[in-house]
């Protein structure tokens, strides 16, 4: 609908979603990008059309409900008028240089249990890496390996922190293991699927207080029945978010008086507060599979994807497989091995990320 025909609640709701969707991991660009979404502050809910636009701090219905003025409660405006601002959408940072990452494979001795606290502290210790790290579970008919890949300049830090938080882990450094396992000749059918957030990114995924049973157990189990010449990969590219998302998140879900922006979904304020209760990360969550048969490659990828359903919270958020429309197929295949992405990452907090990025218990 043309903007001049939108009611005020419709215009403000649309403005909210234009800002919010950047954090869901949906957007695809024509070349690899930095995975943290380009940041634009959310200053508050007001119309930005005519000069002297009046601040309207009424609470609005969600995007999926009817947007009608009857939902609004009349309130005294916070201010008589504001100075309109011009929204300039920043472009992502495009990645021109490819870096061959060093892989560190790690395994825990039998009966070793990983705590959520140790796994979370390990993630936080990687805050100064020069480029996103990659957590990977790679399955073949012979083995299932867990590895962390990082830029050569970050490898020492990765190794030291891994030893500090998981001294019992047995680790070894390798180069090009994934590249050697990944078929680039076109002789195998390849499926690559990324997962994004289904709902507003400030709604957190289900988080686990304990890793007993391990959240990754189902995913690893889905790789246990691979045939020869088949490959399965679960890959998470991740890095700490650098921008001040927390402040904008709270301004986006509240009106100017601190009340919920969405009158029929006041719970979103509590959920957003939970989201920013631990540091935010950008992450590309990816599943890849290869097999001589296309149908089989899809079944492998779907089997891994089903294991991600345990992160779903019906009252909050869930991961959903994303369309590859606009993502060049050859580029997509190369991005798996190069640990890069033409798709922006999702914004998740540490507690959400650690459910997916940790050494699985033996």
Where are these regions (language model features)?
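Extended, folded cores of ATP/NTP-driven motor/assembly subunits in large transport
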Residues: 1-362
């Amino acid at each position: 609908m043309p903007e001049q025909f939108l009611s005020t609640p419709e215009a403000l709701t649309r403005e909210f979603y234009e800002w919010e969707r950047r954090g869901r991991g949906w957007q695809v660009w024509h070349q690899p990008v930095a995975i943290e979404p380009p940041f634009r502050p959310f200053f508050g809910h007001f119309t930005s059309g005519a000069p002297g636009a009046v601040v309207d701090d009424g609470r609005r219905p969600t995007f999926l409900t009817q947007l009608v003025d009857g939902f609004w409660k009349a309130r005294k405006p916070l201010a008589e008028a504001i100075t309109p601002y011009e929204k300039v959408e920043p472009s992502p940072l495009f990645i021109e240089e490819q870096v061959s990452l060093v892989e560190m494979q790690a395994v825990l001795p039998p009966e070793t249990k990983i705590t959520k606290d140790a796994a979370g502290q390990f993630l936080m210790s990687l805050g100064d890496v020069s480029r996103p790290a990659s957590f990977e579970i790679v399955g073949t008919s012979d083995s299932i390996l867990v590895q962390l890949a990082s830029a050569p300049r970050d490898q020492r830090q990765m190794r030291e922190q891994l030893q500090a938080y998981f001294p019992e882990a047995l680790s070894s450094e390798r180069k090009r293991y994934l590249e050697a396992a990944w078929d680039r000749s076109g002789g195998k059918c390849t499926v690559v699927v990324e997962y994004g957030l289904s709902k507003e990114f400030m709604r957190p995924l289900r988080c686990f207080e304990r890793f007993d049973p391990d959240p990754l157990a189902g995913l690893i189990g889905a790789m246990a029945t691979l045939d020869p010449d088949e490959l399965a990969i679960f890959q998470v590219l991740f890095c700490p978010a650098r921008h001040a998302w927390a402040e904008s998140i709270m301004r986006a879900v509240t009106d100017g008086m601190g009340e919920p922006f969405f009158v029929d979904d006041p719970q979103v304020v509590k959920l957003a507060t939970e989201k920013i209760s631990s540091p935010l990360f950008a992450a590309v969550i990816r599943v890849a599979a290869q097999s001589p048969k296309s149908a089989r490659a899809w079944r492998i990828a779907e089997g891994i994807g089903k294991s991600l359903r345990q992160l779903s919270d019906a009252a909050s958020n869930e991961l959903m497989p994303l369309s590859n429309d606009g993502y060049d197929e050859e580029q997509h295949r190369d991005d798996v091995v190069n640990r890069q992405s033409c798709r922006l990452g999702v914004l998740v907090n540490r507690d959400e990320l650690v459910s997916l990025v940790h050494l699985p218990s033996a």
